[in-house]
Amino acid sequence: MTVISPDATTTAGGPPPPAVSRRSRRRRGRVFDWMAIPAIVVLAGVIGYPMVRAIQLSFTNTNLLNSGGNKSVGFSNYHTLFTNDPIFWQSLDHTMVYTFVSVVAAGLIGLLLALATENLGGIWRVVRTMMLTPWGVPVVVVAFLFYYMFQDSGGVVNQALMNLGIIHTPILWLGNARWAMTSVIVANVWSTTPFFLLMFTAALASVPNEVVEAARVDRAGALSMLTRIKLPYLRTAAVLGTLLMVIQNFNNFPLIYSMTKGGPVNSTTTLVIYVYELAFDQFHLGFASAVGVIWLAILLVFAAVFIRLMKERVS
């Protein structure tokens, strides 16, 4: 038996590649650093400056309707928010409910659809592809679609429920504080479920066939196959998808505003809607900036905690 050593292979294939000196690597690294400067400048201008400016405005009483209103007020805006602004606390509560219910519902439905269509071929592949269609529909289009579906007179939802005998009189879905948030969440879940379906489908495709076959040889049941074999591979997709969807739902303005404009009676007013109303309806830029800073701080804390938990799980 002939044994081919690494040295022999290198010699037969030609002369070894020239060694790269430490100075060359350092020079190449500096070139890459200089190439990154334009991107850093653009990010600093597009993201950094507005963020710093918003923090500065949050400590002033800036109001576009008052030419003299640009004085420093310290932490007065924050004190008012926490102690004398019930709408802020309502909007924060609505944001949490909207985000939590939307992410959990869309994630569970996406997981069930991914598992149900995992091993199906033929026409079911086409069906699964069609399930991804809502993800490509613009948010404003989704908002107007469900806006007309939830109309009390002539809406598809009321007509279907009345034909099934579930209700006898039309429900004022978007004009009732009890049902408005539910209607908005349903529209959002329909729009974001395909994202989780795509994430979980890709994660299931990464499960090694050898592991699945070994589990079948050991006569693992469907539940054991799911909990012990597939779920560990789905964990990263679930964590990443949840983080991205929480950020998106926290910032979701066009869907809610197009359907309800935050009403009725502030029942669907979230933080992003409240900031918009303060800044562009009431022109209180200082107060709106204070809400925006708190909104950003909540997102940063959530992202930091979530990423740390993900790293601990991986380690």
Predicted ranges, named:
Residues 31-315:
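A structural signal for multi-pass alpha-helical bundles of membrane permease subunits
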Residues 1-22:
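Short, intrinsically disordered terminal tails adjacent to the first/last structured region
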Residues 18-30, 228:
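Short, Lys/Arg-rich N-terminal segment immediately upstream of the first membrane anchor
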